[in-house]
């Protein structure tokens, strides 16, 4: 890259080349010499030559063609930079070498064939490019600021949602704690009530037994005294004494009544199930929180030609007119089916489907293995790599081998699918009532995908969420 010539900066006022005084109303000739306008000779004084040329600069005697404009060229703002080599002011710029030039530099052999212009003229293209770049950068900056503003708004929305969810979680657990505390108080109150009943019946039992012991003690003492009486006295009251000696059967009272024992046993059974209920609740809560309810979409590469997918790939409907689609080893051609995306090879996952059944039509919802048959006739069973339920207006059955008829009270409109890969479990349930429809036990190997099929005109299913 050409180096910039050495410049020296002085702090003197520019001088006229003719009068050597400060420049007033400065102009420059094409050669680069600078004069006061009043110091420059008139054109008639320069004189026209017979060769058709005129003298433009009285110092360097430079001649130009007569048709060349002879008016002195006005200077732009004069700087205070001088050529260090020649001591002349810098007026020119060489675009080829990117160097500042004085008059002598410009006339030198180095720059004869180069593009040389006045500083003000030479700088204009650069200024234009800088302005253009400045405009582009300003636009880019504005766009980035707009994007940043939008992203900040999205971020703020997310942060607000997170804050709301935090409050919801705190409120939910606070309500749960209140309900658990209420149930704890009820259980303890019931236990205290049973405890009081036990003590009450114990006191009653002790009272009855004590009374009987006292009665028997008094009778024993009386009989002992009779035994010490003389025969004449004892025989005198023989009939009375015999009646007193007759044994009376004492019915021993029960310490705790059978009714109270039954209440205690019933309550004991309830208490025994409490730890298991708490454990199941904890496991179900953890299970629910671990479930991935991510976005499921329909994979168009697997869709049968008899199916029409929505633009957002969330809905599919049946059509009698098969679509002209490129063949693919992934595409179903024997069954109007489509797989969901993504597939899963681990974890717990859940999704929900809205069903619309056409006249005589139906839908299939479930899970299929990655190696499920795509071409020709395919079976719907676990042996074929499909774990699903088939739903029509009249009935619902599971894709077992043979199929399992599911006598439901009503045909579900919304069906949920819960996949537990590690447990090898696929559960389908009524998403409105949360009632289970059917649970498959499986041993997965490789990826499994959400599986859907619809048949007959008017049948349609839509992924929710």
Curated annotation (Swiss-Prot):
Subcellular locations according to the entry? Cytoplasm; Nucleus; Cell junction, Focal adhesion
Alphabetical GO CC annotations of the entry are:
cytoplasm; focal adhesion; nucleus
Question: SUPFAM superfamilies attached here?
Answer: B-box zinc-binding domain (SSF57845), Concanavalin A-like lectins/glucanases (SSF49899), RING/U-box (SSF57850)
Q: What's the Enzyme Commission number for this chain? A: 2.3.2.27
One GO BP annotation here? positive regulation of RIG-I signaling pathway
Catalytic activity, reaction form: S-ubiquitinyl-[E2 ubiquitin-conjugating enzyme]-L-cysteine + [acceptor protein]-L-lysine = [E2 ubiquitin-conjugating enzyme]-L-cysteine + N(6)-ubiquitinyl-[acceptor protein]-L-lysine
Start-end of RING-type zinc fingers? 16-61
- The record's top EC class is transferase
Entry coiled-coil feature ranges: 126-229
Binding sites annotated in the UniProt record for Zn(2+):
83, 86, 105, 111
Q: Name one Pfam family in it.
A: zf-B_box
Q: Which InterPro entries match?
A: B30.2/SPRY (IPR001870), B30.2/SPRY_sf (IPR043136), Butyrophylin_SPRY (IPR003879), ConA-like_dom_sf (IPR013320), PRY (IPR006574), SPRY_dom (IPR003877), TRIM/RBCC (IPR050143), Znf_B-box (IPR000315)
Query: Known PANTHER family for this protein?
Result: E3 UBIQUITIN-PROTEIN LIGASE TRIM
- The protein's role, per its UniProt record: E3 ubiquitin ligase that plays a role in several processes including innate antiviral immnity, cell migration and chemotaxis. Acts as a 'Lys-63'-specific ubiquitin ligase for MAPK1/ERK2 and MAPK3/ERK1, promoting their activation by facilitating their interaction with MAP2K1 and MAP2K2. Also plays a role in cell migration and chemotaxis by acting as a stable focal adhesion component upon recruitment by multi-adapter protein paxillin/PXN. Functions in the RIGI-mediated interferon induction pathway upstream or at the level of MAVS.
Q: Which family does it belong to?
A: Belongs to the TRIM/RBCC family.
Q: How does it assemble?
A: Interacts with paxillin/PXN; this interaction recruits TRIM15 to focal adhesions. Interacts with TRIM8; this interaction prevents TRIM8 cytoplasmic translocation.
Please identify the protein, giving its name as recorded: E3 ubiquitin-protein ligase TRIM15
Q: Which organism is it from?
A: Macaca mulatta (Rhesus macaque)
Q: Which gene holds the coding sequence for this protein?
A: TRIM15
């Amino acid at each position: 890259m050409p180096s910039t010539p050495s410049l020296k900066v002085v702090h003197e006022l520019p001088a006229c080349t003719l009068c050597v005084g400060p420049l007033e109303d400065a102009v420059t000739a094409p050669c680069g010499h600078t004069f006061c306008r009043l110091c420059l000779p008139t054109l008639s004084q320069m004189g026209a030559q017979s060769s058709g040329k005129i003298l433009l600069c009285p110092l360097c005697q430079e001649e130009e063609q007569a048709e060349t404009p002879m008016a002195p060229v006005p200077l732009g703002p004069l700087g205070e930079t001088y050529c260090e080599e020649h001591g002349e002011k810098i007026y020119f710029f060489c675009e080829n070498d990117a160097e500042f030039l004085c008059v002598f530099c410009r006339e030198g052999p180095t720059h004869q064939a180069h593009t040389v212009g006045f500083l003000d003229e030479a700088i204009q293209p650069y200024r234009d490019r800088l302005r253009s770049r400045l405009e582009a950068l300003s636009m880019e900056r504005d766009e980035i600021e707009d994007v940043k503003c939008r992203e900040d708004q999205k971020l703020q929305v997310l942060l607000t949602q997170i804050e709301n969810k935090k409050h919801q979680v705190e409120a939910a657990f606070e309500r749960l704690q209140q309900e658990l505390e209420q149930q704890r108080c009820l259980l303890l109150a019931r236990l205290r009530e049973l405890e009081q009943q036990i003590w009450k019946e114990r006191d009653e039992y002790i009272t009855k037994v004590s009374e009987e012991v006292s009665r028997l003690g008094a009778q024993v003492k009386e009989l002992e005294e009779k035994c010490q009486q003389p025969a004449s006295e004892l025989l005198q009251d023989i009939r009375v004494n015999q009646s007193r000696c007759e044994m009376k059967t004492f019915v021993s009272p029960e310490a705790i009544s059978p009714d109270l024992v039954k209440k205690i046993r019933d309550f004991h059974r309830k208490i025994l199930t409490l730890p298991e209920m708490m454990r199941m609740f904890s496991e179900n809560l953890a299970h629910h929180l671990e479930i991935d309810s991510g976005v499921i979409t329909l994979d168009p590469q697997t869709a049968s030609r008899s199916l029409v997918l929505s633009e957002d790939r969330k809905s599919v409907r049946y059509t009698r007119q098969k679509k002209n689609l490129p063949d693919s080893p992934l595409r179903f051609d024997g069954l109007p089916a489509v797989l969901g995306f993504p597939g899963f090879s681990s974890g717990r996952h859940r999704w929900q489907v809205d069903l619309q059944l056409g006249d005589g039509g139906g839908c299939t919802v479930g899970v299929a293995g990655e190696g499920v048959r795509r071409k020709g006739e395919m079976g719907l069973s676990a042996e074929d790599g499909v774990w699903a339920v088939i739903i029509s207006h009249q009935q619902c059955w599971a894709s077992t081998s043979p199929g399992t008829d599911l006598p439901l009270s009503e045909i579900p409109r919304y069906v949920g699918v819960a996949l537990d890969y590690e447990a090898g479990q696929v559960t389908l349930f009524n998403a409105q009532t949360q009632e289970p429809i059917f649970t498959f036990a499986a041993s997965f190997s490789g990826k499994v995908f959400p599986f859907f099929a619809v048949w007959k005109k008017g049948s349609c299913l839509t992924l929710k969420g």
